[in-house]
Swiss-Prot record:
This is Cell division control protein 2 homolog 1. ATP binds at residues 7-15, 30. GO terms for cellular component: cyclin-dependent protein kinase holoenzyme complex; cytoplasm; nucleus. It comes from Medicago sativa. The lineage of its organism: Eukaryota, Viridiplantae, Streptophyta, Embryophyta, Tracheophyta. It is an enzyme of class 2 (transferase).
Amino acid sequence: GENVEKIGEGTYGVVYKARDRVTNETIALKKIRLEQEDEGVPSTAIREISLLKEMQHRNIVRLQDVVHSDKRLYLVFEYLDLDLKKHMDSSPEFIKDPRQVKMFLYQMLCGIAYCHSHRVLHRDLKPQNLLIDRRTNSLKLADFGLARAFGIPVRTFTHEVVTLWYRAPEILLGSRHYSTPVDVWSVGCIFAEMANRRPLSPGDSEIDELFKIFRILGTPNEDTWPGVTSLPDFKSTFPRWPSKDLATVVPNLEPAGLDLLNSMLCLDPTKRITARSAVEHEYFKDIKFVP
């Protein structure tokens, strides 16, 4: 690429904006910093990433190419300059439109259902990696599948703490056997944040995050979540909070929206709605593609 410009720092390394000399289109170039700098790029990571090139869906940021040169890995993505976090911060009036919230949620779920059908998890969904195409007003998920290829660091390479606000309770409780429901949880948190215009449970440590979740949804026990007490980080000394009615927590949602949110924010991952079923939920029966 020509005239490369640094535009940000992602979870895994520096992100540049560049122009593809051949096609003349603008691309985003992610330089992946690997923990084991000396050994170069693990072949498992290369395999995982190569599979992601096959993933093509209108609500997923397309991975166009993978360049592996001198112990470094560069991922070439389509370029989008706006993410949902910036969008919520800069144009609050836009997100006040319930049709727009519904539209974005629908697109998120379509993208996730597609990934899950290909057995790919995201694991780190947050407003910062939901990108918006201003021309079509469509939302696309970025960084799908990278967590599996590279792991999720506790801190980014610039030592920023990776956010816990969208992390599912089973991960926070130390479960090693989590699956696709973790992404549905994250989307539920983002749904509530779009409706409330502020994060649902902004914890600043794993225990603070768990307790913020429990204060809203109630502390789980063997009745509400069979198996929870045997998760590695569950403590019988956790305070026992009752659950709140979500209508008081997210007052701006229509009843069908609350019903969907309730089924996404189910503490027990086995009872959580799937992305595929969520797309079919009655909340979306009047979906209008907002121009």
